[in-house]
Curated annotation (Swiss-Prot):
Residue positions, PTM Phosphoserine: S215
Region (GAF domain): 1-155
Native species: Bacillus cereus (strain ATCC 10987 / NRS 248)
Pfam families cross-referenced by the UniProt entry: CodY, HTH_CodY
Keywords linked to the UniProt accession: Cytoplasm, DNA-binding, Phosphoprotein, Repressor, Transcription, Transcription regulation
GO BP terms: negative regulation of DNA-templated transcription
Family the entry assigns: Belongs to the CodY family.
Role according to the record: DNA-binding global transcriptional regulator which is involved in the adaptive response to starvation and acts by directly or indirectly controlling the expression of numerous genes in response to nutrient availability. During rapid exponential growth, CodY is highly active and represses genes whose products allow adaptation to nutrient depletion.
Protein name: Global transcriptional regulator CodY
Domain of life: Bacteria
């Protein structure tokens, strides 16, 4: 397959995504097919975002690593020493993707490391490995193109996470600001009693202890539930089951107490 045809195959994957998140597993499969190598897309912390195997490596440690989708921490950290594409590293290299305990089996193993960079920061690493055949310029062009695409996708996901985080925080702040002084006091006592993200409590006991009416507690819970911050369910005589749905809620509540 010529370089242009291989590039078009990668482009076809991106075009089929059409604004949707690119699946790192599919991306790895396509890279594996066009570059004809084992492909590992590794995050900054060593998480395997995607991988595809062209040549099976019979090694228990490697199999466990793939099952756990996690590269060893020491190896992941060492990858940050590589700041530009390093190709055709042999099995004696500290960066080899082949199991060092089986060097005699993988003497022909070659590894190529491609940093994934986006927005001026290191986002991860693309690791390619194959037996025998060297990585040529065409392979490296495809690898660097792929790493750019992966970098853009990681940046997009990070931007979405930040946006979602801000949205969750805003929802919590609005829900808390909708509470009256007595309702806020009730909520503080409820989650002090709950001491976690979910549990069972008896509203009337809290009302008696704090010196507020049960209706204040009911109204406060209803406001938080309608905002999607918590879920509550009456279990009759047993009390009310409460579960926090928005992970920003308890942090914001704690911050209010310290102010």
């Amino acid at each position: 397959m010529e370089l242009l045809a291989k590039t078009r195959k990668l482009n076809a994957l991106l075009q089929s995504a059409a604004g949707k998140p690119v699946n790192f597993r599919e991306m790895s499969d396509t890279m594996c097919e066009v570059i004809e190598a084992n492909v590992f897309v590794v995050s900054r912390r060593g998480k395997l975002l995607g991988y595809a195997i062209h040549q099976q490596i019979e090694n228990e440690r490697m199999k466990q690593m793939l099952a756990e989708r996690q590269f060893p921490e020491e190896y992941t950290q060492s990858l940050f020493n590589i700041t530009e594409t390093s190709s055709n590293l042999d099995v004696n290299s500290a960066y080899t993707a082949f199991p060092v305990e089986n060097k005699e089996l993988f003497g022909q193993g070659l590894t190529t490391i491609v940093p994934i960079v986006g927005g001026g920061e290191r986002l991860g690493t693309l690791v390619l490995a194959r037996l025998g055949q060297e990585f040529l310029d065409d392979d490296l062009i495809l690898a660097e193109y792929s790493s750019t695409v992966v970098g853009m996708e990681i940046l997009r996901e990070k931007a979405e996470e930040i946006e979602e985080e801000a949205r969750s925080k805003a929802v919590v702040q609005m829900a808390i600001s909708s509470l009256s002084y007595s309702e806020l006091e009730a909520i503080e006592h409820i989650f002090e009693e709950l001491n976690g993200t979910e549990g069972l409590l008896v509203a009337s006991k809290i009302a008696d202890r704090v010196g507020i009416t049960r209706s204040v507690i009911v109204n406060a819970l209803r406001k938080l539930e309608s905002a999607g911050v918590i879920e509550s369910r009456s279990l009759g005589m047993k009390g009310t089951y409460i579960k926090v749905l928005n992970d920003k809620f308890l942090h914001e509540l704690a911050x209010l107490k310290t102010n």
